[in-house]
Structures are given as C-alpha cells and as structure tokens.
A protein has these predicted regions:
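Short helix-coil boundary/hinge micro-motifs
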Residues: 4-151
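Short, charged surface segments at domain edges that flank catalytic/cofactor-binding sites
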Residues: 133-176
C-alpha cells in the first residue's frame, strides 16, 4: 500500500545516471514538471508527444549539462523501473525493458506516462505531499543557487501558471534550511 513515506523514499531512491561528479537531471526535471501539473489538477497520465517531449527538452537545455543533444524520452521511459511510474500504450513499441524506444514510436503510439494509480491517488488525497516531494527533489538534485530559478522555469513552461506551487516549494525549502 502506498504511503507518503514510501513515495518519499522511492523518489529519494530514483536511479540517476552519474559519471564522476556529473549527474543527469533528466528524471528530477521530469518529476518536477509532472508534480507542478498535478498541483494544478492535471490528469494522471501525460502524452509524451504533446505534453512531455518539448517541455522536458526545454528544461534539459536550460538546466542540464551542455550536450549536443538531449533525450527526454530516456527518463520518461526509464522512470518505470523506479517503482511509482506507469506507462500506457507501450505494447506496440519495439523496445521493452529499460532501453527506451525511439521518440517516433512514443509519439506514433500515443505512449502516456505518469505516477501509477496508487501513488497518484495518494497525491490527490494529500496535495501538501506534492510540494514536499518537489522540495525534496530540488534539494537532492539541484544546487541551491538554481533551485528558485528551476522552480520558476518549470512554472513558465506550464500553460497556466500556478503561483502557489512556487511559493509552497520555496516555503518548504526555507523551513528546512
């Protein structure tokens, strides 16, 4: 059974690609984007082609390491191995397991992802949990110097800005400093 504590632990334990001191921010940025939208009442699942690809690519270009190319399909697909993420319409994708299919397949087959039903219900029942998870992600994966900017950018990418989400994240962050 899902609880706040088990979800917090699952978020803390997400697998992150690392090379030396470098860490990939892909999964944390995707989770922050999804949580911001849940805060505003978004449905459980996000269509990769219309709701995730471009938005996450923008976040990766702004807050990710300098690279020739970013691959927002990687965290979208690979989060399913972290115990709380669900994907739908994957049966026609050429790849299964942890290796992600090409972006074209995710779009063509309308692959959608988001928190699984049990954890989504928990977030809907306890809206304060969304803010505390966002704070947890910001603190664990982003330097203090860009945490506020990261929260702002995620809000700007959303079509309808919810100023309360940013305030909750910042308030939660300052309480734990």
């Amino acid at each position: 059974m899902a609880s706040s504590k088990t979800l917090e632990q699952a978020i803390a334990d997400i697998t992150i690609w690392r090379k030396g001191e470098q860490r990939a921010p892909h999964k944390p940025l995707l989770l922050l984007y999804v949580l911001a939208n849940y805060q505003h009442g978004h449905a459980r699942l996000f269509d990769y082609g219309t709701e995730v690809h471009e938005q996450l690519l923008n976040l990766l270009e702004r807050f990710g390491p300098q690279r020739k190319a970013h691959y927002p399909n990687m965290p979208f697909w690979r989060l399913k191995g972290d115990g709380f993420w669900d994907l739908k319409n994957t049966e026609f994708c050429s790849t299964t397991g942890s290796k992600q299919p090409p972006v074209k397949e995710l779009v063509e087959h309308n692959v959608a992802g988001g928190f699984d039903e049990e954890h989504f219900a928990l977030l809907n029942k306890n809206k304060n949990l969304i803010g505390s998870l966002a704070q947890q992600i910001l603190e664990a994966h982003f330097p203090e110097s860009i945490q506020e900017e990261s929260a702002d950018e995620i809000q700007q990418i959303r079509k309808v800005r919810d100023p309360l989400f940013r305030q909750q994240v910042l308030r939660a962050y300052t309480m734990n400093v």
